[in-house]
């Protein structure tokens, strides 16, 4: 299941994402975050990725937002964000 979900995200990265201007406000990008979250947390990683996409808008903060080691739908604050 993980491989299938990751393949879907990679298909998006290859075929759909290039059609739009760069707009992700975080590092790693939302699609890379989704892949990392799925690899680390399985199906719960999909929920984490969706929550991340919902946080990625012009009014949100920017910066480093790595996948946490534990399941969470909130942004992981890093020392550089303070």
Curated annotation (Swiss-Prot):
Keyword Cell membrane: yes
Membrane topology: Peripheral membrane protein
InterPro entries per the UniProt record, alphabetical: Membr_insert_effic_factor_YidD
SMART domains: Haemolytic
GO cellular component, one term: plasma membrane
Localization in the cell: Cell membrane
Keywords of the record: Cell membrane, Membrane
Family: Belongs to the UPF0161 family.
Role description: Could be involved in insertion of integral membrane proteins into the membrane.
PANTHER family named in the record: MEMBRANE PROTEIN INSERTION EFFICIENCY FACTOR-RELATED
NCBIfam families recorded: membrane protein insertion efficiency factor YidD
Protein name (Swiss-Prot/TrEMBL): Putative membrane protein insertion efficiency factor
């Amino acid at each position: 299941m993980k491989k299938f979900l990751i393949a879907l995200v990679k298909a998006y990265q290859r075929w759909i994402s290039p059609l739009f201007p760069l707009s992700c406000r975080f590092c790693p990008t939302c699609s890379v975050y989704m892949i990392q979250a799925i690899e680390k947390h399985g199906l719960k990683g999909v929920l984490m990725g969706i929550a991340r996409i919902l946080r990625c808008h012009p009014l949100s903060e920017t910066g480093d937002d790595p996948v946490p080691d534990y399941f969470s739908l909130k942004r992981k604050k890093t020392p550089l964000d303070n």
